[in-house]
């Protein structure tokens, strides 16, 4: 089988420190990376609050999270390209609705998000846009809704939380590393998801 390419972002805190991997993101099969400056020159890293882009890195992450939770009802829906975005199919609104419908009547589920701890990285592209890596946490909370009821975590959530049953509820946090192409400010082009990596980072009782 063909191994999908991975985009690595390595960060060096100072000239004497070792490089450390900040992001390791699997690219989408259809991803086309925009051109950046040659390695001999180096791509410029843009400030997190740069006004040169259609959306700042943090705003891009927040907007995409809103799409994963609301789909076409999100105010940001038309700002992002849907073609080739397999993460929406995996964890988007339809997947969340399927989780909700699979629960018994004695339990409820809520979905939320927050920015992750990793600092965003934006590298300028030759067309005045940027390749942007961001860290987003998606949070799933399952709670019993009736007295005496309980919830039963499964799979990785069960293994990481160490719980087989809970009368209080379970909260699981999934860390998303997302890679986008963000066009220049004023551009009519859409933001494109170039790749992503997702993993369960925390799980426990409420």
Where are each of the predicted segments found?
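Residue-identity detector for glutamine
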Residues: 12-13, 97-98, 143, 156, ...
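A short linear-motif detector with a strong N-terminal bias
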Residues: 101-102, 109-113, 157-160
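Core segments of small alpha/beta cavity-forming domains
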Residues: 36-109
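Short beta-strand edge/turn micro-motifs at domain boundaries
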Residues: 2-66, 129-131, 164-206
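Mixed-charge, low-complexity intrinsically disordered segments
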Residues: 146-169
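Generic structural motif
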Residues: 70-71, 137-143, 183-185
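Surface-exposed, charged secondary-structure patches
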Residues: 1-4, 108-153
């Amino acid at each position: 089988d063909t191994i999908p390419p991975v985009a690595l972002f390595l960060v060096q805190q100072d000239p004497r420190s070792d490089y450390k991997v900040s992001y390791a993101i699997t690219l989408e099969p259809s991803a086309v990376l925009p051109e950046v400056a040659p390695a001999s020159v180096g791509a410029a890293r843009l400030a997190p609050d740069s006004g040169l882009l259609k959306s700042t890195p943090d705003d891009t992450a927040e907007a995409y999270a809103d799409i994963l939770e609301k789909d076409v009802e999100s105010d940001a829906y038309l700002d992002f390209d849907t073609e080739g975005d397999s993460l929406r199919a995996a964890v988007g609104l339809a997947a969340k609705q399927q989780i909700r419908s699979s629960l018994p009547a004695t339990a409820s589920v809520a979905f939320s998000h927050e920015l992750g701890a990793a600092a965003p990285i934006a590298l300028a592209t030759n067309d005045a846009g940027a390749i942007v890596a961001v860290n987003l946490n998606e949070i799933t909370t399952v709670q019993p809704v009736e007295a005496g009821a309980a919830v039963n975590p499964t799979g990785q959530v069960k293994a990481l939380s160490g719980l087989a049953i809970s009368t209080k509820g379970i909260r699981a946090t999934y860390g998303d590393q997302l890679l986008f192409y963000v066009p220049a400010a004023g551009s009519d082009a859409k933001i494109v998801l170039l790749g992503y990596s997702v993993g369960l980072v925390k799980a426990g009782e409420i």
